[in-house]
From Swiss-Prot:
The keyword Phosphoprotein does not apply. It comes from the Eukaryota. Contains 3 disulfide bonds. The keyword Endoplasmic reticulum does not apply. This is Putative neurotoxin 5. It comes from Scolopendra mutilans (Chinese red-headed centipede).
């Protein structure tokens, strides 16, 4: 019984992480770089945000 409960908790934890990754949006002043393989963010034109800050974020098509 303990093994089933542990497996359920781990599965739910992984599911929450997966959902969080899929719905990540770029920070304010950044936009999704659709040309990048990993769908990283980049600064919007005219934004003062540094590229390093935007690159630290990932986004997915449909959420950017």
């Amino acid at each position: 019984m303990k093994n089933k409960f542990a497996a359920l908790v781990i599965t739910l934890f992984v599911l929450v992480l997966a959902i969080d990754n899929v719905t990540t949006q770029c920070l304010e002043g950044c936009e999704c770089n659709q040309e990048s393989t990993g769908k990283t963010c980049r600064p919007k034109q005219g934004s003062n945000v540094s590229p390093a800050v935007c690159l630290a974020q990932y986004c997915y098509h449909g959420y950017c």
